[in-house]
């Protein structure tokens, strides 16, 4: 299963938040700031937008998400070392689930 973290943030100059949060899977950052730009590497994508609001940011993240399993999170989350395994196994145990809260 393909896991993608969808993370909303503000005024991030780079993608260092990914390392700070201990995210090891694919990640999409929606960065609310004063410019409209995009950045992509092998596992990190960052869309900088002038749109404001957490709901707008999360909706944009869902629109551009590519993961089979998507995790919406805040920019102050720190992920456990085995989060990918735990989440993927939960969806394997509950194949009909659309949403699982952790």
Where are these regions (language model features)?
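The conserved acidic donor/metal-binding loop of glycosyltransferases
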Residues: 74-78
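Short, polar loop motifs at secondary-structure junctions
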Residues: 10-13, 30-36
